[in-house]
Each structure stands twice: as structure tokens, then as C-alpha cells.
């Protein structure tokens, strides 16, 4: 049994984390909740008990074994090292440490054994990947081990909940006022007057926005979401030379990120062998047609529409489609699964 802390215990994804800790019967002797000063003193119910939220900036983390951080990069950069210095193993769900070469970036089914188990953590911190990257990793791992992954071309279809409450409110707020006249869009894309967009660069209701994230000021024309796909895939899969081209798109879906993936390998790999491997892969469910609705609320990433890529010679290419719950496996679940693996070794 372990003593666990949840930092950033209030909010959208944090509720999912608390629910999962209960549902999975996490082996905790005690649980402490931490948040920003404005949430200090609030009461949260966990396992039938009311627990008072502590101030993450001033609380003493001594006595904790593991802390699950889901409070955003700004707080993580300051507080995660402070918790780690107190001897707490930190599993951080923000972007703060993903690029740090001394911090393992982990998907529980993919690289915990390689990068964490039996290793000394240089900074006492483990990073959780971006929710979009997360959906693809359990699918790509067994395929890479079988045939040697060389290149990925990916288009994402990212739910508005990936932008937080603001994204959810923007989609709902734009859809409600125009829903009765939506058929007019068949003939005239300017027929409806949407509320002005705030979160996105264009209306998201009944539309797509091929700009998820923010432009990176490096002349590449890429967004930070595009680059996360590349950088995180390389680090998690352990393929520093992996070629990755990504276009991340925001779509009018409330929950569930999806990816269209074209993968090129060094060796031939058949559709039949691919399905055999994925049927046995941890964290993966093989289906005919994955959708974000079907992925909502389940632990596994859904994969389907698997076919040979005719653009890659010698049977070395695959095309497939993946959907995953961005608030479940894409965030809270992976964090908890890492903590479960850590707890088993304590």
C-alpha cells in the first residue's frame, strides 16, 4: 500500500482521475488532494470520505510515495521538482518535462519496463505524453517490434475537450444558436451567423479547424501539436531517427481524439499479421471502424480500417485509423497506470 497525492485535484480531467482511482481500487493507504490557492479548503469526496484540498504551493509533501500532477505546466515546473526533492515520485500530466532528456516520457504499456522499471529516476519525475500521441503508441509498438518503423504520416482529428472547458463551451455555444437552421449550410457556407470564435481561429461548430495548438515560431509552419507528434513518438518508441509528418486538426467532437496513420516499415508486414499482433497488444482493441464515440469511456485505444498502403513498395506500408478517449487513456488513465506499476515495485 502507498501514500498518494493528486496535484490539481479540481477541474475537467481531474474528476476523471479521482473516479479512476476509485474504480480501479488503487492500492493507497492514504490519498491527499492538492490544488492552487483558490481551491484550498474545498472538500472532495473519495471512497466515501470528504478530503480537504491542500495548497499545492505551501503544503508539505513529506510522507507521500507518489504524486500525480495534473495542474498544468506552470505549476508543474515549480512544484513537481519540490515534491521530488522530498522523495516523492512525480508522474506529471503536463507538457513541462516531456522534452527533458533526463525525464522518461512513458506510455504504461509501451516503455515503462524499458525506461523506468529498475532505473534510478534522475529527477524523480515521469512525464505523461500528449493525449494525441498517446492514442497511437500502444498500436505502433508491436508493429515496430515486428517490422521496424521508419516513417509516419499522421492527420489527427482532435476533440474540443483537448482545449479544456473553453473548447467545450465554444463548440456548444456556437452550435446551440444555429442548430434549427443548420440545413442551410448545404447550399451556403455563410448562411448562419455563429457567435464569434474565441478559442479557435474559425468557428468549430459544423466545421473543422486545421490548426490544433499554436504556431511554433521556427519557420516550419508547424504547430506545437504537430511537433509533439514527432518528438514524443521518437522518445516513447525509442526511435530517434523516426520520420514523422503530422497535421493536427480540431474537429467538432466533444470527446475522443482520432488519428489517420500511414506507417512505413523497413520490413514487409501484412494486414493479417498486423491484425494478429494488434489483437494481442496491451491497451489496444481491434475493431472494424473506430470512432471517438465508441472510444469514449473505455480504457483501450481502438484501431481499425487496417489496409496495405499502396504508396509504399514491397508491402512495407500500412494505413490504419485509431481513436482513443483523450480524457481517459489520453490523460488520467495512463498517469494512474504508471502509478500502479510504480506501486507494485515499492
Swiss-Prot record:
This is Aspartate-semialdehyde dehydrogenase. It catalyses: L-aspartate 4-semialdehyde + phosphate + NADP(+) = 4-phospho-L-aspartate + NADPH + H(+). Substrate binds at residues 158, 250. Belongs to the aspartate-semialdehyde dehydrogenase family. PANTHER family: ASPARTATE-SEMIALDEHYDE DEHYDROGENASE, DEHYDROGENASE, PUTATIVE-RELATED. One of its GO terms (molecular function) is NADP binding. Its EC number is 1.2.1.11. CDD domains: ASADH_C_bac_euk_like (cd18131), VcASADH2_like_N (cd02316). Pathway: Amino-acid biosynthesis; L-lysine biosynthesis via DAP pathway; (S)-tetrahydrodipicolinate from L-aspartate: step 2/4; Amino-acid biosynthesis; L-methionine biosynthesis via de novo pathway; L-homoserine from L-aspartate: step 2/3; Amino-acid biosynthesis; L-threonine biosynthesis; L-threonine from L-aspartate: step 2/5. The active site is at 131 (acyl-thioester intermediate), 257 (proton acceptor). HAMAP family: ASADH (MF_02121). Gene3D superfamilies: Dihydrodipicolinate Reductase, domain 2, NAD(P)-binding Rossmann-like Domain. Catalyzes the NADPH-dependent formation of L-aspartate-semialdehyde (L-ASA) by the reductive dephosphorylation of L-aspartyl-4-phosphate. Homodimer. It holds the Pfam family Semialdhyde_dh. NADP(+) binds at residues 10-13, 38-39, 161-162, 326. It comes from Mycolicibacterium smegmatis. Phosphate binds at residues 98, 228.
Amino acid at each position: 500500500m502507498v501514500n498518494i497525492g493528486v496535484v490539481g485535484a479540481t477541474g475537467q480531467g481531474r474528476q476523471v482521475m479521482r473516479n479512476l482511482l476509485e474504480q480501479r481500487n488503487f492500492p493507497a493507504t492514504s490519498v491527499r488532494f492538492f490544488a492552487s490557492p483558490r481551491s484550498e479548503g474545498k472538500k472532495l469526496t473519495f471512497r466515501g470520505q470528504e478530503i480537504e484540498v491542500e495548497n499545492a504551493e505551501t503544503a508539505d509533501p513529506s510522507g507521500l510515495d507518489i504524486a500525480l500532477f495534473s495542474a498544468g505546466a506552470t505549476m508543474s515546473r515549480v512544484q513537481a521538482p519540490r515534491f521530488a526533492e522530498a522523495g516523492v515520485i512525480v508522474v506529471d500530466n503536463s507538457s513541462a518535462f516531456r522534452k527533458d532528456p533526463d525525464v522518461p516520457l512513458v506510455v504504461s504499456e509501451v516503455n515503462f519496463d524499458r525506461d523506468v522499471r529498475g532505473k534510478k529516476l534522475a529527477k524523480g519525475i515521469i512525464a505523461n505524453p500528449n493525449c494525441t500521441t498517446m492514442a497511437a503508441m500502444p498500436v505502433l509498438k508491436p508493429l515496430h517490434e515486428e517490422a521496424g518503423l521508419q516513417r509516419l504520416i499522421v492527420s489527427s482529428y482532435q476533440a474540443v475537450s483537448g482545449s479544456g472547458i473553453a473548447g467545450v463551451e465554444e463548440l456548444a455555444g456556437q452550435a446551440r444558436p444555429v442548430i434549427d437552421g443548420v440545413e442551410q449550410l448545404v447550399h451556403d457556407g455563410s448562411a448562419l451567423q455563429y457567435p464569434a470564435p474565441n478559442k479557435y481561429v474559425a468557428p468549430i461548430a459544423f466545421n473543422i479547424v486545421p490548426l490544433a495548438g499554436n504556431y511554433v515560431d521556427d519557420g516550419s509552419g508547424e504547430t506545437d501539436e504537430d511537433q509533439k507528434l514527432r518528438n514524443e513518438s521518437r522518445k516513447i518508441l525509442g526511435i530517434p531517427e523516426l520520420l514523422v509528418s503530422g497535421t493536427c486538426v480540431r474537429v467538432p467532437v466533444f470527446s475522443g481524439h482520432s488519428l489517420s496513420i500511414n506507417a512505413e516499415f523497413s520490413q514487409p508486414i501484412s494486414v493479417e499479421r498486423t491484425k494478429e499482433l494488434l489483437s494481442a497488444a496491451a491497451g489496444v482493441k481491434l475493431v472494424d471502424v473506430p470512432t471517438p464515440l465508441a472510444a469514449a469511456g473505455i480504457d483501450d485505444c481502438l484501431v481499425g480500417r487496417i489496409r496495405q498502403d499502396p504508396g509504399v513498395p514491397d508491402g512495407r506500408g500500412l494505413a490504419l485509423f485509431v481513436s482513443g478517449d483523450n480524457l481517459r487513456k489520453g490523460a488520467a488513465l495512463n498517469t494512474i497506470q504508471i502509478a500502479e506499476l510504480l506501486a507494485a515495485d515499492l
